[in-house]
Amino acid sequence: HPSFLAMCTGNLPTPAANTAEDEGPYKYFTPKLYTGDGASTLAITGLQFQPDWTWIKNRDTTDAHMFFDSSRGVTERLTIDTAVEGTDADTLKSFTSDGFTVGADVKCNTNTEKYVSWNWKINGGTTSSETDGGINTTCQTDADRGISIIQYAGDGGSSDVTMEHNLGVKPEFLIMKDRDSNGNNN
């Protein structure tokens, strides 16, 4: 029929951008490259949000990956290759409205060394205690974006367990770290 158009993107209307409703991924996840200066305080800015979870890796050396989150507190770090979580005031010092601040620790701020950080906004650090699963959890969740930080104490057994994550759907991807020992990271 001559008045019909082919069904393709070229024939579909283009919606006008609405910056008031713009929910692009950059508002919730931003990678950031930076160069250390070795000073006691280095501000990393330009994220356009205050992160709740920051993952830092030195790109010039084999230093450990470090994880920080607003649920546990900024100086509480997790590293993949160490036995337990640690507290270090010279690593991540603060989450800020536009990024974060690091101290002089070599794993996050050696003069002239290059770093990458991956940064997620979740919900501002608000947690809830959940008892619906087989193991009690403390969750910081943004179900709309499908991300949550979960803390729990294992049951000490080898049986399968369930735990609440507040996402509303089965997670597609998990990162798990034993905070008390150098067990396998999953």
Question: Residues of each region from the PLM?
Answer:
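Surface-exposed molecular-recognition determinants
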Residues: 1-186
